[in-house]
Amino acid sequence: MKKLFILFFTTILVQTCTYANNLEYINISFWQKFNDNILVDNLIKVYENNNDLKAAVLKTNEANRIVKMSFANELPHIGFEGYVGRIFKSSDEVFGNITIPNYAETHYYLPLSMNYEVDIWGKNHLITKSKKKQFEIVKQDERSAYIYITSAFAVDYFNLIRCDKLIDYQRQLITLQEQAINSYKIRYEYGTATLSEIDEAEKNLTYMKEDLHKLLEKQDMLKNQISTLLGDRAFKDISRSHYEDLNFSFTTPDSIDFNMLDKRPDRIKSELDLERIGIDVKVARRDLLPKFIITGNLGFNMYNLHSSHKFLADLGIVPVWDLFMGGRKLQMLKLK
């Protein structure tokens, strides 16, 4: 029970830390300048529920794990490769003047094996650096997703508020036009209005109703878009402020600092991608050089569990050089 509690607490803590780290992508302090708590609450819902943002976070976590896997290749690999087997009756074995008659025995081979590629050319370390650059690129993709989706939600949110107000105005215009038509009809009975005036007023009423229908369609479209961004199409209605309650407390700057362009995710991503390509070229070149692998075993090799001659230890270095692979490595270098 205690282990389950610790696991649950750790999971909640990790999720909270991830939420805190990614919340800055939404720039809540900026949106608070709109003095609209409903907008801020909806933006937090977008972060919690939007599927595209969840996918972006998962890709970032995946890229981070790939970096750790690449770093693991720089370290020695230690494993257990045991063997237990039985040699049954065999024919005589002759070694010069020595003859070993047929025999049967059981072998126990229980070593710890170690392999380590000596990174004398720095290739494995460069591969890890390349994966780190790719991780930074994916982080910029995640940042771009937060900026794009947050901005798209804010635009749809304020357009929906504006559309609500336009619908209200349009309904008021329709009511006034209907009153005007009734007035024309009364005047017509007294001979102070003509049928053409009534027809013109009714035609204008039809146009107004068509405009109202278009506004209602646009309102429905905006609601669907916002529901999609919120990550739940089951919302019956979208919480939003009234047009009269909007009160922006910030001013639009007259100019933008040119250095701000250097912080754009796409610009940072392009620079990181160029750096990654340069590293990959170095990796492809050093892949043409020989490798040196240190290998060793430490354990037991015996045919009798009670034998005193059972300790096994060996250590060696294996040079590996691919002399011919059909030109694959050269093509890989050109590809980079």
Residue ranges of model-derived segments:
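Sec-dependent N-terminal signal peptides
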Residues: 4-13
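Small/polar, glycine/serine/threonine/aspartate-rich low-complexity segments that form flexible
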Residues: 22-35, 82-113, 236-253, 259, ...
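Transmembrane beta-barrel architecture of outer-membrane proteins
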Residues: 39-41, 55, 107-111, 155, ...
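Membrane-embedded beta-strand positions of outer-membrane beta-barrel proteins
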Residues: 78-82, 270, 292-296
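Periplasmic alpha-helical coiled-coil/stalk elements that build and connect Gram-negative outer-membrane
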Residues: 124, 133, 140-256
